[in-house]
UniProtKB/Swiss-Prot annotation:
Protein's name according to its UniProt entry: Synaptotagmin-4
One record GO biological process: neurotransmitter secretion
GO CC aspect terms: astrocyte projection; axon; dendrite; dense core granule; exocytic vesicle; glutamatergic synapse; Golgi apparatus; membrane
Localization of this protein: Cytoplasmic vesicle, Secretory vesicle, Neuronal dense core vesicle membrane
Keywords: Calcium, Cytoplasmic vesicle, Differentiation, Membrane, Metal-binding, Phosphoprotein, Repeat, Transmembrane, Transmembrane helix
Transmembrane segments: 17-37
Gene designation: Syt4
Length: 425
């Protein structure tokens, strides 16, 4: 019988054909994947920013020229300009304030000097802004000053506002502050910085860097918030808190500035503003509020169950609105803290409901030396949290705290809940 040679040739050609088709398929797949990636990248670059606040920090000087020297916000003093020649600016810093919103530098003007942006403001522009700030409408929107606050003189804040319609970006530039009081009695100076909050949401808080030992700090920092429609700007307010950094204790509050944006037109370009810093209006009630807690001592397991239930009538932290309270629970044995817990933060409410349970291990013989401290704090993102009120339960505690603790010891295995008035922290 003759051999079948034809079928063998056909079987030998099949792997070659399959290999060719596989190579073409691989090249097509890689090309298709690369094309899809390019399309996604181009679509992502052309996509409009989402409706949310994003702050971008600009204009941070690495080496400020002279933090203690005063800078003129308006036009230069003519008497000083005539007597002194313009010196070249030899200090190294990032002049990011001169960039546009896209991050590009504008074309250089050979006629322009090397002075900073604050000194380039023309006297005419500052005069118009000053007239607007002193107009009756502006005086109505600005915070009124009492006679006592006018005598105290806490300084002046200089800033600028701008809106970019193409990017839907709201730009706030904190330029400088002048004439701040000395918070350090020894050095007769301050370490100032500024916190800014957008109201009424109170969700978006930013702050400048700390400038050391100066009463006339030049911040020149820009914060950009993208995705805000221009009509929504009229519903917002800007709250500035001027503070002095303290390394060893709570930062000192110098004063505050509140600027309602209703009636302010930003369609004509950048608007320069000056506002007097006034004494902080804490708007706190006579009391610190109340806290409802429930405790139970289990003698069989030597455990103390603490339930933080509710808080009510908590005072406002400041004019920026309601506080964001949470409770910190500290367990002490002979005046030494041996354990700590804390609840979740409740946003913008004077009447918070926590309902959170904590269990602490306690030896039975040392129950008389145990005390429980409750600290109600206001959550401040990016800074130290402020203590709203304090409560102590223990054998040596005064008032309702001592009575509540006595009931816990006398009636073990019973959950005992009581309201307590908070005292100063």
């Amino acid at each position: 019988m003759a051999p079948i040679t034809t079928s063998r040739v056909e079987f030998d050609e099949i792997p070659t054909v399959v290999g060719i088709f596989s190579a073409f398929g691989l090249v097509f797949t890689v090309s298709l994947f690369a094309w899809i990636c390019c399309q996604r990248r181009s679509a992502k670059s052309n996509k409009t920013p989402p409706y949310k606040f994003v702050h971008v920090l600009k204009g941070v000087d690495i080496y400020p020229e002279n933090l203690s020297s005063k800078k003129k916000f308006g036009g230069d003093d003519k008497s000083e300009v005539k007597g002194k020649a313009a010196l070249p600016n030899l200090s190294l810093h990032l002049d990011l304030e001169k960039r546009d919103l896209n991050g590009n530098f504008p074309k250089a003007n050979p006629k322009a000097g090397s002075s900073s942006d604050l000194e380039n403001v023309t006297p005419k522009l500052f005069t118009e802004t000053e007239k607007e700030a002193n107009s009756p409408e502006s005086l109505k929107s600005s915070t009124s000053l009492t006679s006592e606050e006018k005598q105290e003189k806490l300084g002046t804040l200089f800033l600028s506002l701008e809106y970019n319609f193409e990017k839907k970006a709201f730009v706030v530039n904190i330029k400088e502050a002048q004439g701040l009081p000395a918070m350090d009695e020894q050095s007769m100076t301050s370490d100032p910085y500024i916190k800014m909050t957008i109201l009424p949401e109170k969700k978006h808080r930013v702050k400048t860097r700390v400038l050391r030992k100066t009463l006339d700090p030049v911040f020149d920092e820009t914060f950009t918030f993208y995705g805000i429609p221009y009509p929504h700007i009229q519903e917002l307010s800007l709250h500035f808190t001027v503070l002095s950094f303290d390394r060893f204790s709570r930062d000192d509050v110098i004063g505050e500035v509140l600027i309602p944006l209703s009636g302010i037109e930003l369609s004509d370009g950048k608007m320069l503003m000056t506002r007097e810093i006034i004494k902080r209006n804490a708007k706190k009630s006579s009391g610190r509020g109340e806290l409802l807690v429930s405790l139970c001592y289990q003698s069989t397991t030597n455990t103390l169950t603490v339930v933080v239930l509710k808080a009510r009538h908590l005072p406002k932290s400041d004019v920026s609105g309601l506080s964001d309270p949470y409770v910190k629970v500290n367990l002490y044995h002979a005046k030494k803290r041996i354990s700590k817990k804390k609840t979740h933060v409740k946003k913008c409410t004077p009447n918070a409901v926590f309902n959170e349970l904590f269990v602490f291990d306690i030896p039975c013989e040392s129950l008389e030396e145990i005390s429980v401290e409750f600290l109600v704090l206001d959550s401040e993102r990016g800074s130290r949290n402020e203590v709203i009120g304090r409560l102590v339960l223990g054998a040596t505690a005064e008032g309702s705290g001592g009575g509540h603790w006595k009931e816990i010891c006398d009636f073990p295995r019973r959950q005992i809940a009581k309201w307590h008035m908070l005292c100063d922290g």
